[in-house]
UniProtKB/Swiss-Prot annotation:
SUPFAM superfamilies noted in UniProt: Alkaline phosphatase-like
Assigned keywords, A-Z: Glycolysis, Isomerase
A GO biological-process term: glycolytic process
Record protein name field: Probable 2,3-bisphosphoglycerate-independent phosphoglycerate mutase
Family statement: Belongs to the BPG-independent phosphoglycerate mutase family. A-PGAM subfamily.
Pfam families: Metalloenzyme (PF01676), PhosphMutase (PF10143)
NCBIfam families: apgM, hyp_Hser_kinase, PRK04200.1
Catalytic reactions on record: (2R)-2-phosphoglycerate = (2R)-3-phosphoglycerate
Pathway assigned in UniProt: Carbohydrate degradation; glycolysis; pyruvate from D-glyceraldehyde 3-phosphate: step 3/5
Family annotation (InterPro entries): Alkaline_phosphatase_core_sf, ApgAM_prokaryotes, Metalloenzyme, Pglycerate_mutase_ApgM
Length: 399
């Protein structure tokens, strides 16, 4: 038996007036996901436990089959694992976003949480400049992918409250600055970064090219190294993870899965879908399980871009789900779990903890009478609700 998870990050949403009361999943053309829903088991899963932030970290841990209440320590330690950055027991990792802040009516607002979806090469250039000026034995900066980078505070503080920048798009940053023990050190670093970035040659170059420049860092998502059982210990399977996002790769590292990096995987609508599909099917020749993650719908949700979200969903269906369904046939016995991790509603431009629609499919499953297709309402109407999202993995394995 071969198993594959197809994860459309942030794919679920709310009914929208612009779509005649439909959600993007209902409005998008998704014949392959619809076919799975009509022949498989469809329902809703609550991937974010009550009281936990509805982040991709918590939600993806659930879909991997891990109870976040038992192993979640924060987002950035997972990203550090993906990047090969070792954390001592007293070290605290932070996500570093390259952002654009804009003066508006006497305050600074979060204009763009991704600095115009800055490229990986440009992001590396800036983080290396920041490390050169601001890096010390205590604070160290590591380049990642696109706008997503890492800082480690050696023997650092961990009790402060921080806010994800994508949660405050268009809002003043003043009421959202870090608070609590150690917060003043983080604010100092963010302020110092503005001097480095505003004086970097890249700032003027991006302005001249009509692009949004990075003019600050934003620190968030902190935590210490987690303790997790390996995927093989937990489920008795070998596996691999395919994603452009360090967070998801990091969960794979902590779970002892192979992390497969695909050239051209960007975490955006221009990602290399075909390369991911090829890598997934090749990995299943050697492994029992693959987790194939696509970030594009989530990025469209954060940007509030309906056109991009519809395109991301349709590309996910046509360029990932369809080819995977066809490619799995050669294995004979297989199961596919297709799901978002959490909703990222266009109206809110951030995540919610609402249950997500999932479909569990195998080539042997029979017709589902009355199921219209794969979307939030069809999943709700089916009446199946998995209250503990981490049990989706047990359902997939029939345990």
């Amino acid at each position: 038996m071969k198993y594959i998870v197809l994860l459309g990050d942030g794919m679920s949403d709310e009914p929208m007036q612009e779509l005649g009361g439909k959600t993007p999943l209902q409005a998008a053309r998704t014949p392959h996901m619809d076919a799975m829903a009509r022949r498989g088991r469809i329902g809703l899963a609550r991937t974010v436990p009550e009281g936990y932030p509805p982040g991709s970290d918590v939600a993806n841990l659930s879909v991997f089959g891990y109870d976040p209440r038992a192993c979640y320590t924060g987002r950035s330690p997972l990203e550090a694992a993906s990047m090969g950055v070792e954390l001592g027991s007293a070290d605290v990792a932070f996500r570093v976003n390259l952002v654009n802040l804009a003066p508006t009516r006497g305050t600074l607002v979060m204009n763009d949480y991704s600095a115009g979806h800055i490229s990986t090469a440009e992001g590396r250039e800036l983080i290396e400049a920041i490390q050169g000026v601001m890096g010390t034995d205590e604070f160290q900066f590591y380049p990642g992918v696109g706008y997503r980078h890492l800082m480690v505070w050696r023997n650092g503080k961990c009790g402060m409250t921080v806010v994800p920048p994508h949660d405050i798009s268009g809002q003043s940053i003043l009421e959202h600055l870090p608070k609590g023990e150690g917060a003043e050190r983080l604010i100092e670093l963010m302020n110092s970064s503005q001097l480095v970035l505003n004086n970097h040659p890249q700032y003027r170059r991006r302005l001249e090219e009509g692009k949004v420049p990075a003019n600050s860092i934003w620190l968030w998502g902190h935590g210490k190294a987690p303790r997790m059982a390996s995927f093989h210990e937990k489920f008795g399977l070998t596996g691999a993870v395919i994603s452009a996002v360090d967070l998801v790769r990091g969960i794979g590292v902590c779970a002892g899965l192979d992390v497969i990096k695909v050239e051209g995987a960007t975490g955006y609508i221009d990602t290399n879908y075909e390369g991911k599909v090829t890598a997934a099917l090749e990995a299943l020749e050697a492994h029992d399980y693959v987790y194939l993650h696509v970030e594009a719908p989530d990025e469209a949700g954060h940007g509030g871009n309906l056109e991009h979200k519809l395109k991301a969903i349709e590309d996910f269906d046509a360029r990932v789900v369809g080819p995977i369904m066809a490619g799995m046939e050669k294995f004979g016995s297989y199961r596919i779990l297709c799901t978002p991790d959490h909703p990222t509603p266009l109206r809110l431009k951030t995540h919610t903890d609402a249950p997500v629609p999932f479909v569990l499919f195998s080539g042997e499953t029979s017709e589902n009478a009355g199921v219209a297709g794969y979307d939030e309402e069809s999943a709700r109407s089916a009446g199946l609700v998995v209250e503990d999202g981490f049990r989706l993995m047990e359902m997939m394995l029939d345990r």
